[in-house]
């Protein structure tokens, strides 16, 4: 009964204002890993969700590359977006492994946020193992104030108010660890998250396994679609089950003790110090699936 009620309460179309959410990652699949479940929840509730990859992913493979790989990854991203049910998955043509927080890329981000009329913007934290992740995080921070400045990118109308900017979760602790200000249960949507990641064939079943052990590990990856998805499902669920004591406190805050104790899979977000500084009431309005 709990899961039936919990699922219906999150998936029923919201009668409130439709929200515009844009998640900005460095590569096709970044947003899917860190926000895919919550994005699917927003989409199921009738809100407008866009994923934006700042690079085309044309370097992320052990045996393919260049334009052919970029085209492959763009199509994988489109397929992932369809699986998640989001409105749009856009991949820019900046080269993978070469992303810089340049003025040109900043302007791309400013225009994208404005054109989506974003209420919520998600990005990487600017401290990460991958230079593209770091620079993607920095360029979103650099754009955070400029989205309301009329004389910057005057070809796109400025936003009337600053959106809520959020950091997607990572495991790095220096200079400080991720702070789980908002923790969302994705129990009733985890299969859609897996479907979205499953669409990134070149990454889930080729490139990422290879980076963890080369051809020896790659040879152990299942070859049939069903076995691959089962293999991926186990890993995504393990990754989504990282509920430590701090995240549990946040879950209790947003869902109440009884519901929070039953949550198995989550995604976690940190409120950035830039842009809108929300009250708890604001967060519940912007994350309607959190309402008790």
Locate each region found by the language model:
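Internal, well-ordered alpha-helical segments in soluble enzyme and binding-protein domains
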Residues: 105, 132-140, 161, 189, ...
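Conserved acidic residues
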Residues: 87, 119, 163
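C-terminal accessory domains and tails appended to enzymatic cores
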Residues: 153-154, 159-161, 176, 182-292
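Short acidic, glycine/proline-rich loop/turn micro-motifs
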Residues: 61-64, 176-180
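Active-site rim/loop-helix segments in enzyme catalytic domains that contact anionic ligands
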Residues: 13-116, 138, 146, 156-157
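Active-site cores that bind ATP or allylic diphosphates and position pyrophosphate for catalysis
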Residues: 149, 159-163, 167-168
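Active-site adenylate/phosphate-handling loop in enzymes that bind or generate adenylated species
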Residues: 112-156
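Bacterial Sec-dependent N-terminal signal peptides
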Residues: 1-16
């Amino acid at each position: 009964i709990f899961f039936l009620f919990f699922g219906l309460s999150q998936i029923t179309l919201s009668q409130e204002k439709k929200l515009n959410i844009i998640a900005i990652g460095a590569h096709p699949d970044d947003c899917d890993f860190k926000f895919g479940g919550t994005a699917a929840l927003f989409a199921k509730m009738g809100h407008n969700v866009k994923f934006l990859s700042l690079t085309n992913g044309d370097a992320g493979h052990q045996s393919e590359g260049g334009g052919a790989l970029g085209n492959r990854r763009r199509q994988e991203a489109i397929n992932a977006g369809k699986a998640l049910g989001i409105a749009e998955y856009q991949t820019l043509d900046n080269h993978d492994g070469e992303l810089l927080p340049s003025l040109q890329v900043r302007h791309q981000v400013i225009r994208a946020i404005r054109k989506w009329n974003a209420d919520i913007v998600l990005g990487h934290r600017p401290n990460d193992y991958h230079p593209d992740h770091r620079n993607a995080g920095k360029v979103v921070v650099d754009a955070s104030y400029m989205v309301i400045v009329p004389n910057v990118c005057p070809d796109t109308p400025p936003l009337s108010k600053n959106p809520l900017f959020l950091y997607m979760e990572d495991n790095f602790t220096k200079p400080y660890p991720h702070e789980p200000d908002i923790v969302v249960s994705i129990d009733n949507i985890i299969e859609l998250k897996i479907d979205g990641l499953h669409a990134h064939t070149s990454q889930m079943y080729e490139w990422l396994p290879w980076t963890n052990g080369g051809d020896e590990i790659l040879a152990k990856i299942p070859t049939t679609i069903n076995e691959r998805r089962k293999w991926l499902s186990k890993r995504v669920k393990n990754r989504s089950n990282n509920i430590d004591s701090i995240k549990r406190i946040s879950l209790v805050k947003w869902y109440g003790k009884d519901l929070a104790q039953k949550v198995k899979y989550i995604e976690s977000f940190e409120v950035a110090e830039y842009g809108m500084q929300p009250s708890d009431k604001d967060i519940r309005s912007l994350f309607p699936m959190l309402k008790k």
